Amino acid sequence: MSSQKQLEGMIFDVQSFSVHDGPGCRTTVFLNGCPLSCKWCANPESWTVRPHMMFSELSCQYENGCTVCHGKCKNGALSFNLDNKPVIDWNICKDCESFECVNSCYYNAFKLCAKPYTVDELVQVIKRDSNNWRSNGGVTFSGGEPLLQHEFLHEVLLKCHEVNIHTAIETSACVSNEVFNKIFNDIDFAFIDIKHMDREKHKEQTGVYNDLILENISNLANSDWNGRLVLRVPVISGFNDSDENISDIISFMHKNNLVEINLLPFHRLGESKWTQLGKEYEYSDKGDVDEGHLEELQDIFLDNGIACYVGHETAF
Protein backbone atom coordinates (compact mmCIF):
# COMPACT_ATOMS: atom_id res chain seq x y z
CA MET A 1 0.00 0.00 0.00
CA SER A 2 1.48 3.37 -1.02
CA SER A 3 1.86 6.06 1.59
CA GLN A 4 -0.17 9.24 1.30
CA LYS A 5 1.60 12.02 -0.58
CA GLN A 6 2.85 14.70 1.79
CA LEU A 7 1.90 18.33 1.53
CA GLU A 8 4.47 20.53 -0.17
CA GLY A 9 5.30 24.11 0.72
CA MET A 10 7.14 26.72 -1.30
CA ILE A 11 10.17 28.17 0.49
CA PHE A 12 12.41 30.94 -0.81
CA ASP A 13 15.10 30.83 1.87
CA VAL A 14 16.23 29.05 5.02
CA GLN A 15 18.69 30.90 7.25
CA SER A 16 20.65 29.30 10.06
CA PHE A 17 22.17 31.16 13.02
CA SER A 18 19.47 33.85 13.09
CA VAL A 19 19.67 35.88 16.30
CA HIS A 20 17.08 38.62 15.64
CA ASP A 21 13.99 36.53 14.82
CA GLY A 22 13.01 35.35 18.29
CA PRO A 23 14.63 34.03 21.46
CA GLY A 24 18.10 32.51 21.17
CA CYS A 25 19.86 31.32 18.05
CA ARG A 26 17.27 30.20 15.50
CA THR A 27 16.62 28.75 12.08
CA THR A 28 14.41 31.09 10.05
CA VAL A 29 12.26 29.64 7.27
CA PHE A 30 10.93 32.08 4.66
CA LEU A 31 7.69 30.94 3.04
CA ASN A 32 6.42 32.25 -0.28
CA GLY A 33 3.20 34.20 -0.67
CA CYS A 34 1.90 37.45 0.79
CA PRO A 35 -1.49 39.22 0.69
CA LEU A 36 0.24 42.58 1.10
CA SER A 37 2.35 44.42 -1.46
CA CYS A 38 4.21 46.93 0.69
CA LYS A 39 5.97 49.54 -1.41
CA TRP A 40 9.11 49.28 0.75
CA CYS A 41 9.17 45.46 0.89
CA ALA A 42 12.62 43.92 1.39
CA ASN A 43 11.50 40.54 0.02
CA PRO A 44 9.33 41.23 -3.05
CA GLU A 45 10.33 37.84 -4.45
CA SER A 46 8.09 36.36 -1.77
CA TRP A 47 4.80 37.86 -2.95
CA THR A 48 3.62 34.88 -5.00
CA VAL A 49 3.51 31.26 -3.85
CA ARG A 50 4.25 29.84 -7.29
CA PRO A 51 7.88 29.84 -8.52
CA HIS A 52 9.03 32.75 -10.62
CA MET A 53 12.31 33.99 -12.02
CA MET A 54 14.73 36.73 -10.98
CA PHE A 55 17.50 38.09 -13.20
CA SER A 56 20.79 39.46 -11.84
CA GLU A 57 22.59 41.55 -14.44
CA LEU A 58 25.69 41.60 -12.23
CA SER A 59 25.95 37.81 -12.43
CA CYS A 60 25.25 37.62 -16.15
CA GLN A 61 28.27 37.04 -18.43
CA TYR A 62 26.76 38.65 -21.53
CA GLU A 63 29.68 41.10 -21.76
CA ASN A 64 32.04 38.13 -22.06
CA GLY A 65 30.09 36.72 -24.99
CA CYS A 66 28.04 34.11 -23.12
CA THR A 67 25.06 32.92 -25.17
CA VAL A 68 23.94 29.76 -23.34
CA CYS A 69 20.46 31.17 -22.70
CA HIS A 70 19.90 32.22 -26.33
CA GLY A 71 16.91 30.47 -27.81
CA LYS A 72 16.02 28.76 -24.54
CA CYS A 73 12.79 30.63 -23.79
CA LYS A 74 10.03 29.02 -25.84
CA ASN A 75 7.51 31.64 -24.77
CA GLY A 76 9.30 34.61 -26.31
CA ALA A 77 9.95 36.41 -23.03
CA LEU A 78 13.72 36.58 -23.54
CA SER A 79 15.42 38.67 -26.21
CA PHE A 80 18.82 40.36 -26.50
CA ASN A 81 19.92 43.88 -27.36
CA LEU A 82 22.83 44.84 -29.62
CA ASP A 83 25.24 44.41 -26.69
CA ASN A 84 24.05 40.82 -26.11
CA LYS A 85 22.37 41.86 -22.85
CA PRO A 86 19.22 39.86 -21.98
CA VAL A 87 15.97 41.82 -22.22
CA ILE A 88 13.01 40.27 -20.38
CA ASP A 89 9.33 40.75 -21.14
CA TRP A 90 8.07 40.31 -17.59
CA ASN A 91 4.42 40.18 -18.66
CA ILE A 92 5.18 36.95 -20.50
CA CYS A 93 7.74 35.66 -18.02
CA LYS A 94 5.37 35.79 -15.04
CA ASP A 95 3.30 32.92 -16.47
CA CYS A 96 6.25 30.62 -17.19
CA GLU A 97 6.28 27.11 -15.75
CA SER A 98 9.34 25.58 -17.45
CA PHE A 99 12.14 28.09 -16.70
CA GLU A 100 14.52 27.01 -19.47
CA CYS A 101 16.59 30.15 -18.89
CA VAL A 102 17.20 29.17 -15.26
CA ASN A 103 18.13 25.62 -16.17
CA SER A 104 20.57 26.77 -18.87
CA CYS A 105 22.48 29.47 -16.96
CA TYR A 106 25.90 28.47 -15.59
CA TYR A 107 26.30 31.65 -13.54
CA ASN A 108 23.04 31.81 -11.57
CA ALA A 109 22.07 35.04 -13.33
CA PHE A 110 18.61 33.54 -13.79
CA LYS A 111 17.31 31.94 -10.62
CA LEU A 112 14.06 30.78 -9.10
CA CYS A 113 12.84 32.36 -5.89
CA ALA A 114 10.86 29.37 -4.61
CA LYS A 115 11.77 25.79 -3.83
CA PRO A 116 9.33 23.01 -2.92
CA TYR A 117 9.74 21.11 0.35
CA THR A 118 7.65 18.32 1.77
CA VAL A 119 6.76 18.53 5.45
CA ASP A 120 9.37 15.92 6.39
CA GLU A 121 12.05 17.53 4.23
CA LEU A 122 11.62 20.89 5.91
CA VAL A 123 11.44 19.42 9.41
CA GLN A 124 14.67 17.54 8.70
CA VAL A 125 16.37 20.81 7.70
CA ILE A 126 15.10 22.44 10.89
CA LYS A 127 16.23 19.56 13.11
CA ARG A 128 19.64 19.56 11.44
CA ASP A 129 20.30 23.00 12.99
CA SER A 130 19.17 22.05 16.49
CA ASN A 131 22.73 21.73 17.80
CA ASN A 132 23.23 25.42 17.03
CA TRP A 133 20.29 26.62 19.12
CA ARG A 134 21.64 25.78 22.57
CA SER A 135 18.93 25.80 25.24
CA ASN A 136 16.64 28.64 24.15
CA GLY A 137 16.59 28.64 20.35
CA GLY A 138 14.19 27.15 17.84
CA VAL A 139 12.60 27.83 14.47
CA THR A 140 10.96 31.02 13.18
CA PHE A 141 8.58 31.03 10.22
CA SER A 142 8.71 34.22 8.17
CA GLY A 143 7.99 35.31 4.63
CA GLY A 144 6.28 36.67 2.75
CA GLU A 145 3.32 35.78 4.90
CA PRO A 146 3.79 32.25 6.29
CA LEU A 147 0.11 31.93 7.16
CA LEU A 148 -0.85 31.87 3.46
CA GLN A 149 0.50 28.31 3.29
CA HIS A 150 -1.34 27.43 6.47
CA GLU A 151 -2.06 23.77 5.76
CA PHE A 152 1.61 23.04 5.12
CA LEU A 153 2.72 25.24 8.03
CA HIS A 154 0.32 23.53 10.41
CA GLU A 155 1.77 20.11 9.64
CA VAL A 156 5.32 21.39 10.10
CA LEU A 157 4.42 23.01 13.43
CA LEU A 158 2.87 19.80 14.74
CA LYS A 159 6.02 17.85 13.91
CA CYS A 160 8.20 20.52 15.50
CA HIS A 161 6.26 20.36 18.75
CA GLU A 162 6.42 16.56 18.72
CA VAL A 163 10.17 16.94 19.34
CA ASN A 164 9.87 20.02 21.58
CA ILE A 165 11.16 22.58 19.09
CA HIS A 166 10.30 26.16 20.13
CA THR A 167 8.23 27.82 17.38
CA ALA A 168 8.01 31.49 16.44
CA ILE A 169 6.38 33.41 13.62
CA GLU A 170 6.75 36.78 11.88
CA THR A 171 3.38 37.66 10.41
CA SER A 172 1.22 40.46 9.06
CA ALA A 173 -1.85 38.72 10.57
CA CYS A 174 -3.66 39.42 7.29
CA VAL A 175 -5.49 36.09 7.03
CA SER A 176 -8.89 34.81 8.08
CA ASN A 177 -9.67 34.51 11.80
CA GLU A 178 -10.04 30.76 11.37
CA VAL A 179 -6.59 30.29 9.85
CA PHE A 180 -4.97 32.69 12.30
CA ASN A 181 -6.41 30.98 15.37
CA LYS A 182 -5.62 27.48 14.11
CA ILE A 183 -1.95 28.25 13.50
CA PHE A 184 -1.45 30.17 16.74
CA ASN A 185 -2.43 27.11 18.75
CA ASP A 186 1.06 25.85 17.90
CA ILE A 187 3.03 29.11 18.13
CA ASP A 188 5.17 29.96 21.16
CA PHE A 189 6.37 33.44 20.16
CA ALA A 190 5.17 35.99 17.62
CA PHE A 191 6.20 39.20 15.94
CA ILE A 192 3.14 40.84 14.35
CA ASP A 193 3.50 43.91 12.14
CA ILE A 194 1.50 47.08 12.40
CA LYS A 195 2.25 49.21 9.35
CA HIS A 196 -0.27 51.99 10.06
CA MET A 197 -3.37 52.45 12.20
CA ASP A 198 -5.30 54.43 9.58
CA ARG A 199 -7.01 51.98 7.22
CA GLU A 200 -6.85 54.22 4.13
CA LYS A 201 -3.18 55.08 4.58
CA HIS A 202 -2.47 51.43 5.25
CA LYS A 203 -4.11 50.41 1.97
CA GLU A 204 -2.32 53.16 0.05
CA GLN A 205 1.12 51.74 0.88
CA THR A 206 0.40 48.02 1.36
CA GLY A 207 -2.48 47.29 -1.01
CA VAL A 208 -4.85 46.08 1.72
CA TYR A 209 -6.95 47.53 4.54
CA ASN A 210 -5.86 46.83 8.11
CA ASP A 211 -9.23 45.83 9.63
CA LEU A 212 -8.53 42.09 9.61
CA ILE A 213 -5.00 42.61 10.91
CA LEU A 214 -6.11 44.64 13.92
CA GLU A 215 -8.99 42.24 14.57
CA ASN A 216 -6.67 39.24 14.67
CA ILE A 217 -4.22 41.00 16.97
CA SER A 218 -6.99 42.09 19.31
CA ASN A 219 -8.55 38.62 19.39
CA LEU A 220 -5.19 37.03 20.13
CA ALA A 221 -4.37 39.50 22.89
CA ASN A 222 -7.71 38.80 24.58
CA SER A 223 -7.59 35.02 24.21
CA ASP A 224 -6.07 32.36 26.45
CA TRP A 225 -3.03 32.01 24.16
CA ASN A 226 -0.01 31.79 26.46
CA GLY A 227 2.74 32.70 24.01
CA ARG A 228 4.72 35.92 23.87
CA LEU A 229 3.65 38.66 21.44
CA VAL A 230 5.81 41.59 20.31
CA LEU A 231 4.30 44.09 17.88
CA ARG A 232 6.59 45.42 15.16
CA VAL A 233 6.44 48.72 13.32
CA PRO A 234 8.60 49.38 10.24
CA VAL A 235 9.24 53.07 10.91
CA ILE A 236 9.06 55.07 7.67
CA SER A 237 9.54 58.82 7.82
CA GLY A 238 6.49 60.69 6.58
CA PHE A 239 4.31 57.61 6.52
CA ASN A 240 3.74 56.13 9.98
CA ASP A 241 5.91 58.14 12.38
CA SER A 242 3.46 60.99 13.03
CA ASP A 243 2.35 61.89 16.55
CA GLU A 244 -1.19 60.86 15.64
CA ASN A 245 -0.26 57.40 14.41
CA ILE A 246 2.07 56.71 17.34
CA SER A 247 -0.68 57.80 19.72
CA ASP A 248 -3.16 55.51 17.97
CA ILE A 249 -0.77 52.55 18.29
CA ILE A 250 -0.35 53.23 22.00
CA SER A 251 -4.12 53.46 22.51
CA PHE A 252 -4.60 50.18 20.65
CA MET A 253 -1.94 48.50 22.77
CA HIS A 254 -3.39 49.80 26.04
CA LYS A 255 -6.88 48.70 25.03
CA ASN A 256 -5.61 45.17 24.39
CA ASN A 257 -3.10 44.96 27.26
CA LEU A 258 -0.16 44.68 24.86
CA VAL A 259 3.15 45.58 26.47
CA GLU A 260 5.99 45.13 23.94
CA ILE A 261 6.83 46.76 20.63
CA ASN A 262 9.81 46.68 18.27
CA LEU A 263 10.56 49.70 16.05
CA LEU A 264 12.40 48.69 12.87
CA PRO A 265 13.93 51.62 10.97
CA PHE A 266 13.29 51.69 7.22
CA HIS A 267 16.10 50.43 4.98
CA ARG A 268 16.62 49.93 1.25
CA LEU A 269 18.40 46.56 1.43
CA GLY A 270 15.81 44.93 -0.82
CA GLU A 271 16.02 47.47 -3.65
CA SER A 272 18.15 45.27 -5.91
CA LYS A 273 15.54 42.51 -5.67
CA TRP A 274 12.92 44.81 -7.18
CA THR A 275 15.23 45.41 -10.15
CA GLN A 276 15.85 41.67 -10.51
CA LEU A 277 12.08 41.14 -10.68
CA GLY A 278 11.53 43.89 -13.24
CA LYS A 279 9.64 46.01 -10.72
CA GLU A 280 9.91 49.71 -9.96
CA TYR A 281 11.04 50.52 -6.42
CA GLU A 282 9.23 53.69 -5.36
CA TYR A 283 11.28 54.13 -2.18
CA SER A 284 14.70 54.48 -3.84
CA ASP A 285 14.96 58.14 -2.78
CA LYS A 286 13.57 57.62 0.73
CA GLY A 287 16.08 58.56 3.40
CA ASP A 288 17.01 56.61 6.50
CA VAL A 289 15.17 57.29 9.74
CA ASP A 290 17.11 59.67 11.99
CA GLU A 291 18.45 57.87 15.06
CA GLY A 292 17.46 60.77 17.28
CA HIS A 293 13.89 60.52 16.03
CA LEU A 294 13.83 56.79 16.77
CA GLU A 295 14.98 57.51 20.31
CA GLU A 296 12.19 60.07 20.67
CA LEU A 297 9.62 57.51 19.52
CA GLN A 298 11.08 54.94 21.89
CA ASP A 299 10.79 57.37 24.80
CA ILE A 300 7.12 57.99 23.98
CA PHE A 301 6.34 54.28 24.23
CA LEU A 302 8.41 53.87 27.38
CA ASP A 303 6.68 56.85 29.00
CA ASN A 304 3.38 55.10 28.30
CA GLY A 305 4.41 51.90 30.05
CA ILE A 306 5.27 49.94 26.91
CA ALA A 307 8.59 48.12 26.54
CA CYS A 308 10.09 49.41 23.30
CA TYR A 309 13.05 47.96 21.43
CA VAL A 310 14.70 49.74 18.49
CA GLY A 311 16.10 47.84 15.53
CA HIS A 312 17.43 44.44 16.48
CA GLU A 313 17.63 45.37 20.16
CA THR A 314 15.24 42.96 21.86
CA ALA A 315 14.73 41.52 25.32
CA PHE A 316 15.88 38.02 24.41
Curated annotation (Swiss-Prot):
Its cofactor is [4Fe-4S] cluster. One of its GO terms (molecular function) is oxidoreductase activity. SUPFAM superfamilies: 4Fe-4S ferredoxins, Radical SAM enzymes. It is an enzyme of class 1 (oxidoreductase). [4Fe-4S] cluster 1 binds at residues 34, 38, 41. Residues 84-115 form the 4Fe-4S ferredoxin-type domain. Keywords: 4Fe-4S, Iron, Iron-sulfur, Metal-binding, Oxidoreductase, S-adenosyl-L-methionine. Residues 20-307 form the Radical SAM core domain. It catalyses: glycyl-[protein] + reduced [flavodoxin] + S-adenosyl-L-methionine = glycin-2-yl radical-[protein] + semiquinone [flavodoxin] + 5'-deoxyadenosine + L-methionine + H(+). Its EC number is 1.97.1.-. Binds 2 [4Fe-4S] clusters. One cluster is coordinated with 3 cysteines and an exchangeable S-adenosyl-L-methionine. S-adenosyl-L-methionine binds at residues 40-42, 144, 193-195, 267. It comes from the Bacteria. The keyword Acetylation does not apply. [4Fe-4S] cluster 2 binds at residues 60, 66, 69, 105. Monomer. Belongs to the organic radical-activating enzymes family. Catalyzes activation of 4-hydroxyphenylacetate decarboxylase under anaerobic conditions by generation of an organic free radical on a glycine residue, via a homolytic cleavage of S-adenosyl-L-methionine (SAM). PANTHER family: PYRUVATE FORMATE-LYASE 2-ACTIVATING ENZYME, PYRUVATE FORMATE-LYASE-ACTIVATING ENZYME. This is 4-hydroxyphenylacetate decarboxylase activating enzyme. It comes from Clostridioides difficile (strain 630) (Peptoclostridium difficile). The gene is hpdA.
